[in-house]
Amino acid sequence: MITVKVKNLTKKYGDFKALDKVSFEAKKGEILGIVGKSGAGKSTLIRILRGSLDYDEGEVEILGRKDNFKEITAIHLQRNFALWAEPVINNIIRKLYAIRNNADEQLPLEEEWEEYEKTAIEILKLVGLEHKKDAFANILSGGEKQRLILGRQIAKIYEKGEGVLLLDEPATMACPASKQKLLDVIKNIRDKLGITVIITSHLPEIHRYLCDRLILLENGKVKMDGDVEEVLNEFLKKMKPPYKRTPNIKDNAIIQVRNVSKRYYVVHGGETLNLRNVSFDVKEGEILSIIGPSGVGKTVIMRLMAGLELPDEGKIIVDGIDITNYGWERIELRKRIGIMHQEFSLPYYQTVENLLKYRLGLKGEKAIAHAKAKAEELGLSPKIVDALYQLIDVPESERISKLQKMGLTEDIIYKLFPPVVESFEPEEILEALDLGKDILKKKVIELSGGQKVRVAMALQLITKPKILFLDEPFGDLDPITLRDVANYLKIINERFGTTIVLVSHCVEFIKEISDRAILLDENRLVMEGNPEEVCEEFIRRSNARFMKEELKCKN
């Protein structure tokens, strides 16, 4: 039985065709995958199938309907955590109440509770969360929250007994263990409910594990439709070969982490992190990767090394400076550090040149000299100035939040550290990132997805940092673009001697780029050494069957 019919579907944004005469069908009980590079039109297609985006030409029919698709589809989006801060089962019951009564999400009356609870437990079984029914949603892990959201979304399909599940890049940012659980849940939902599932992803391993059939979208057109392996081979044809880097690792440790411990405790939530006695070195010129399951403390360790947080115990020496001690030495050190966070954003209407000059000036000698004079004039201690200066390296939302708590705005940073540019010579960095000088006059809104990633890298590299920290900023890139990024990073390391420390869940990326890797698990450092061996141990501990099957395909 055909459940989804798409014929000559075209969607335009101005003169740009996001989708161009797209046609395909999907059968009941089929898991249909859609693959393509970033910007190929995958998410646009999913939004049209959901009924949340109009189209210009063509026909779309789902379960015999040509409109009101929201009534017969469920959608699961990447990084969407809208949940009630109540027990898990309440989140499902509220959704069921809204569906059955065409009302707001409320809890039913006491006499109705048992009937709602029975259905809610069956839905929780589908997503593997029945054992968590009484836990509060806000203390679930990221992967568990993803599955709870999926449970809420499929409630309508469960109630109606039919529907189509739409998945847009599910679990892209999840660790292998969380990803495995979500993939198994998707299979379970298809098997138990017998519904059609349409999934977009740029990750070949997800399509290999889940899909019965695969469509390749390229520049808004269907380039290929058929066997999963054949379509993936076509998709990956354009991947460049890996750059052969000549390592230049020095004997001295540019970062020393000694007996570092860090604990987080949440009221009503209990202990969320308890890293204990972590010690390791990073040699100058080395590319070191940190790997481990979600919530183990990878980002925390990176933030500690970058001086954005302080350890509860232990010491961290970065380029000869104790980064746990606030003061002018630490401020000077920050000039030699660059950091890219998991979610980076660029202001749409700024030119690349302005962004680069601004960043260069903010970390320049004159800005720091001005801060020293201004601090003396205002009677500010070096500790306060340092605490403010470190905010230039945190994500924008965190910076604004911390300043608001102090009753300040971002103006205070720029008054202390005015971005004065003495000389602007970006050519070397641009060339290493394969960006022409014409990029400088372009606004962010005019850039392609790949260009935005490289400009974000250039912002951190324009100051020629000795150390570059990367906290999973490339987790949602397609494998073709990710190979390009790996090559650029190896070139940067080779040409400028930049020490790179990165956090990633992508084992292929880690194996390709790293000199050494460390594995965090069970609140401690459990393995350190050869990236291939560390990644194999990570996969073993994660019980990630989809990755084991992927390795078999490659071998």
From Swiss-Prot:
The UniProt similarity line reads: Belongs to the ABC transporter superfamily.
Question: What are the residue boundaries of the ABC transporter domain, all occurrences included?
Answer: 4-244, 255-547
What's the superkingdom here? Archaea
- A biological-process GO annotation: organic phosphonate catabolic process
The name under which this protein is listed is Uncharacterized ABC transporter ATP-binding protein MJ1662
Q: Which UniProt keywords apply?
A: ATP-binding, Nucleotide-binding, Repeat, Transport
Which Pfam family is one of this chain's hits?
ABC_tran
Annotated ATP 2 binding lies at G292, P293, S294, G295, V296, G297, K298, T299
Q: Which GO terms describe its molecular function?
A: ATP binding; ATP hydrolysis activity
For ATP 1, which residues are the binding ones? G36, K37, S38, G39, A40, G41, K42, S43
Q: Which InterPro entries match?
A: AAA+_ATPase, ABC_transporter-like_ATP-bd, ABC_transporter-like_CS, P-loop_NTPase
